[in-house]
């Protein structure tokens, strides 16, 4: 059925998953920092992150990916040359995680900013009145409440990141796209293996939808009843 390429394709699929999960973790971290920066009273912080999100959303992902990848490579080689060290090539997986995380960190910034703004201020004021510290307010009030509003955006961003991992094959990463391309060229069946690649991504997104639906229900427990 896969002409002996099942092992290679499976390995490529695992690489794709690893890339997607690692990238979304980095993007979430950047997004939380960015949302905090845009909501802070510090005007400089707000301007920096506003410029970051505007730049990222205004330039195509592939162009940004190539700029970041080659920019990192040039910067690294400049530093190593100054130190008298030979050229160092950036690992495609590391490059992919950094580029995807940096790009989609901008989208997560807007997702989290909107979610934090949707949390009723009365909840925070009540927690403060009960003597909660700022850390406790964030962990026990703001974060759980924010997640209910953020999950649809998180799910959408995750799906986009998952599909955008296909672009990283251009950087030399041996992911599922690269594996199916290799299989297609070797067997003279490129269309068939393109379908195989599409089916694998469809399975990933379908399973992701189920997980996200579960999380949305989990964070909405008691909310609908209270709204009624």
Swiss-Prot record:
Pfam family, one: BPD_transp_1
Ranges of the Periplasmic topological domain: 1-12, 80-87, 172-194
Primary localisation category: membrane
Keywords on record: Amino-acid transport, Cell inner membrane, Cell membrane, Membrane, Transmembrane, Transmembrane helix, Transport
Record GO cellular component, one term: ATP-binding cassette (ABC) transporter complex, substrate-binding subunit-containing
Subcellular location: Cell inner membrane
Family per similarity comment: Belongs to the binding-protein-dependent transport system permease family. HisMQ subfamily.
NCBIfam families with a match to the protein in the record: HEQRo_perm_3TM, PRK15135.1
Stated role: Part of the ABC transporter complex HisPMQJ involved in histidine transport. Is also part of the ABC transporter complex HisPMQ-ArgT involved in lysine/arginine/ornithine transport. Probably responsible for the translocation of the substrate across the membrane.
Annotated protein name in UniProt: Histidine/lysine/arginine/ornithine transport system permease protein HisQ
Gene from which the chain derives: hisQ
């Amino acid at each position: 059925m896969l002409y002996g390429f099942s092992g290679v394709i499976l390995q490529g699929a695992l690489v794709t998953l690893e890339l997607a999960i690692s990238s979304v973790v980095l993007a979430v971290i950047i997004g939380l920092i960015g949302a905090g920066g845009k909501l802070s009273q510090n005007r400089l912080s707000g301007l920096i992150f506003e410029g970051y999100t505007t730049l990222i959303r205004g330039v195509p992902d592939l162009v940004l990916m190539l700029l970041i990848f080659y920019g990192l490579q040039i910067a690294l080689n400049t530093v190593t040359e100054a130190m008298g060290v030979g050229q160092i090539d950036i690992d495609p997986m590391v490059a992919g995680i950094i580029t995807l995380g940096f790009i989609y960190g901008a989208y997560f910034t807007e997702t989290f900013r909107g979610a934090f703004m949707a949390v009723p201020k009365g909840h925070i004021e009540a927690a403060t009145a009960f003597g909660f510290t700022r850390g406790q307010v964030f962990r026990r009030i703001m974060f759980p409440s924010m997640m209910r509003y953020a999950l649809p955006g998180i799910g959408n961003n995750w799906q986009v990141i998952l599909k955008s991992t296909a672009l990283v094959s251009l950087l030399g990463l041996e992911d599922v796209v690269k594996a199916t391309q290799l299989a297609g060229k070797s067997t003279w069946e490129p269309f068939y293996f393109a379908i195989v690649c599409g089916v694998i991504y469809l399975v990933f997104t379908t399973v992701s939808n189920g997980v996200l639906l579960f999380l949305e229900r989990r964070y909405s427990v008691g909310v609908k009843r209270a709204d009624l």
